[in-house]
Design a protein with these regions (language model features):
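Helix-centric, low-specificity signal for extended rod-like, repetitive segments
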Residues: 1-3, 244-245
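Phosphate/dinucleotide-binding and metal-coordinating scaffold of catalytic cores
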Residues: 25-273
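Bacterial N-terminal signal peptides
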Residues: 12-21
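Bacterial N-terminal signal peptides that target proteins for export
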Residues: 2-12
Length: 273
């Protein structure tokens, strides 16, 4: 019995030794700050890559490792500039741009308005000779298109709606010309992340769909009101042009104005949460 016990003990210790690195990695991931994630994305070695078949731009799923932590990331290198493009709707868009740079700009803007927890961390990095955006791979269970198709109801409808209100405000702020349900990712516990902004930041100063502005988080509303053009320009230097920054600020003004009008009509409690 003692011999058998010792054999089982050795087996258990060996199993723990094999499993523990994965447990440590998982634990490390949960406590990484966003600055630590940025550092990892910028400096960790890219050990492998596989191209995705999902999405128009078909980003790459890369595996990175710094010797301690191994994690995947999404790499998008598209940077197209065309005189005009006929969209799927039949509309012709002049000065068409589809660029990875807008992913980085979107994250920078999200940091300024306090929504960076709803986007993956984006940085600029080169791979195989191509510059692109590299973002932290998210633990998503599905996207919004899947959720609707499968008729899945969020476990907490109020919390879900509050997240979606934020996404809608952000979408109006950045004027994404290619918003689609696959760009809203959902975790096991129904946390929402908004991804892929390569066709955002159009030069339009009007809102894309003002009816999407239903309610607004109080903190987000305050940060929108204090958003500074010079700070935005500095934080997105190299990723947004002066005209694109001006367009963001013009849309910001209209978003704030619309919510202020709604507050006057309905009362603050009906609009802000």
């Amino acid at each position: 019995m003692c011999t058998l016990h010792r054999q089982w003990l050795r087996f258990i210790i060996a199993a723990v030794c094999l499993i523990s690195p994965y447990l440590v990695s998982a634990a490390d991931e949960t406590v990484l700050t966003r600055e630590q994630i940025k550092h990892f994305l910028l400096s960790a070695k890219i050990v492998s890559g596989k191209q995705s078949t999902k999405g128009i731009t078909q980003p790459w799923r890369l595996t990175l490792s710094d010797g301690t932590l191994t994690h995947d990331a999404s790499f998008q290198a598209i940077d197209e500039h065309k005189t005009n493009v006929t969209m799927a709707s039949g509309r012709v868009e002049m000065n068409f741009v589809d660029s990875y740079k807008y992913n980085i700009a979107a994250y920078a803007l999200a940091e300024l308005v306090g929504l960076d927890d709803m986007l993956p961390v984006y940085v600029e990095r080169s791979w195989h000779g191509n510059a692109g955006s590299l973002s932290w791979w998210l633990p998503a269970k599905m996207d919004e298109a899947d959720r609707i198709k499968q008729n899945i109801t969020p476990s907490d409808p109020d919390a879900w709606n509050n997240q979606m209100y934020k996404v809608r405000v952000f979408d109006q702020l950045i004027y994404d010309d290619d918003p689609n349900l696959t760009n809203v990712l959902i975790s096991e516990d129904f946390k929402i992340w908004r991804v892929d902004f390569s066709r955002a930041f159009r030069l339009y100063k009007d809102l894309r769909n003002s009816k999407d502005l239903v309610r607004c988080d109080r903190s987000l509303f305050e940060k929108l009101k204090t958003l500074d053009a010079n700070e935005l320009a500095a934080k997105t230097k190299g990723y947004l042009s002066k005209d694109e920054v001006k367009a963001v600020m013009a849309r910001r003004d209209k978003i704030v104005s619309q919510f202020q009008e709604m507050i006057s009509e309905k009362g603050e409690k009906e609009v802000l949460y």
